Amino acid sequence: MSSSSGPLSPQSTTATSSLAAKAANPLSSKVTTVLSSSYADTEFREALALLDERGVQNTAETRRQLRLDLQKEVIDSNGEIIDEFAKVAEQLRRIGTTIGRLNETFNEMKTQIGSAQKTTSSTLIEASQLMIQRRQVEQKQALLGAFNTNFVLSEDETAALTLTSEPVDDLFFAVLAKAKRISKDCEILLGFENQTLGLEIMEQTSKNLNLGFQKLYKWVQREFKTLNLENPQIGSSIRHALRVLAERPSLFQNCLDFLAEAREHVLSNSFHTALTGSSPSGIEDQSVKPIELVAHDTLRYVGDMLAWAHSAAVGEREALEGLFIGEGDEIAKGIQAGRDNEIWRLVAEDGEVSDTFDAVETLNELVDRDLSGAARLLRQRVEQVIQTNEETILAYKLANLLNFYKSTFSRLLSVGSALVETLGALESEALRQFRSLARDHVAAIQGDFQHTPADLRPPEFLLGALEQLAAIMKTYETSFTSSSDREEEFEPVLAEAFDPFISGSANMAKPLRAPSNSIFLINCLLTAERSLSRFDFTQRRAARLQAQIQEERARLVETQYRFFRGESGLDSLIVQLEPLGESKEDIQKALLLESLQSPALSQASQKLDDFLPSALMDAMENLKNLQDSRLVQSITEEAAEKFCVDFEHVEEMLILVDEATEQKQNEQDDIQGPRTLFPRTSGEIRVLLS
């Protein structure tokens, strides 16, 4: 026992530990394996899930048989797979047999195709060549079709373009446009080395184009014969035709000439009907009130004729605008294109540049030509009226009326139009008649220029002339004039209707004595100035008359001044004292003057006293025939003021002389001073003359 319970030797201890470790290794290995297994491992989790699906119970029997069961299932599965692969192998054998038969069939077909290729190779080559030839033929056919389409007119198109039996419609204009395009495109063909084709096509196309334009030209002429410009709905075809025809400027101009002739005839007949109420053939128009019915009223008669011409011109212009301008500047472009295509226009001679077509100017010229026939008839009638008129004012009113319509037509047509020139000539003739009648009137009253009215009032011929001039000026004032200087324009009228009469009045005043000559002339000038000053276009002439009035007024002031000096008895005293001043030498000279001696000075004082009470009335009586009372008063007051100024100088000299006399009175008591003999003062004089 003791031996067994004693300490173990190292050898025995080591052996025991080794056995214990061997016994414990399988378990620890399993535990270690289990512990080291990761439940996150996919295969492990799938295995566990599979066990759950089988419903395996965790029993000792199950744990012993689990491995065997699993191996048995694997073996069974492998057997099933082998059976399936056997079926696949059988099918592969069948496929191999089928492929073998296909290879045999393919080889047979290959042999047959090879033999067929040998027999058909020549045919294929020929077919390929035929296909190439077919494509070439198709290309040529397409080229020929395109060529015919772009460079050749079909028979139907040629007939529509050239035959006059075919209408001028949209087809005609389409073919014409195509022909023009062909002609232009032929320039491309002429760029090739062989120009024969291009020349032939261009020659034929040009021929067809010329025939087409001739057909269009004749058609337009036929349309113009029946064209009614009064109809606001003018056909669009005629406008289109004119735009196209404009490419042939010569034909277009011929059409304009034809239209102008036709419209001239129509408007001439219309004007004749408006004048007489019947056509030139004698057919009466009941709807028209003849203008000739008012022939007795000269101004209205001429005005109605001019108004008709203006209305006709406006209507003609509006209608023709629809033909030539209503479609923009197509006509201008057509004419310019036609001019550019004319050979003689291609090179300008001497640098000459062809004028650009102006549609408005052409329209104005056409309207002017349309009215030329009516204008001739209008001129005949108006000339007859002017020549038979014997009234000066009416002659001027006619000239003014003609001037108004001349300005109106200048804006409507142009300054250089024949109608405006006709009206200008008629206006000049009316003015010549006016001047002639005015001069005849002056010549007829030459005898009246010799008889001045006793009361110095303006003569009757001047009053009549001013009344006539007033009527003329009212007419001119209401008239339309383009002149920037109306006064300058009206001067010729004043030269004929005013100057002879005012000059005659001035000549009548020359033989008269003062102040009658100035009074008469002022009366005439005042009357004339009042007439002229009412109008703005005679202000310069009125100012000249006012200047003449002031000249004559100055003469009357001087006359009245001389009257005051003479009638007051102070003239000699004023004359003698005027050059003297306040110096002692002048005072000594004054003492020796005879007019300052007692008798003469007393007499002058007495005469002054007698004159002063009625001086102003007597002075104004001198101007009683002057028709402007305010002017009489102003003239007299100015003359009195001059007299008072002179008297102040006299008074100053008398005071100085009186002072010198007082010194002598101390020596000689019998000497009287001038102020004693002449006590009047300048203040008293001003009061009495105011």
Swiss-Prot record:
Start and end residues of each stretch annotated as Disordered: 1-22
Subcellular location: Golgi apparatus membrane
Gene Ontology biological process terms from the UniProt entry: intra-Golgi vesicle-mediated transport; protein transport
Cellular component aspect of the GO annotation: Golgi membrane; Golgi transport complex
Membrane disposition: Peripheral membrane protein
SMART domains: COG6 (SM01087)
Key words, A-Z: Golgi apparatus, Membrane, Protein transport, Transport
Major site of localization recorded for this protein: Golgi
InterPro entries per UniProt: COG6, COG6_C, COG6_N
Physiological role: Acts as a component of the peripheral membrane COG complex that is involved in intra-Golgi protein trafficking. COG is located at the cis-Golgi, and regulates tethering of retrograde intra-Golgi vesicles and possibly a number of other membrane trafficking events.
Family: Belongs to the COG6 family.
Name this polypeptide is given: Conserved oligomeric Golgi complex subunit 6
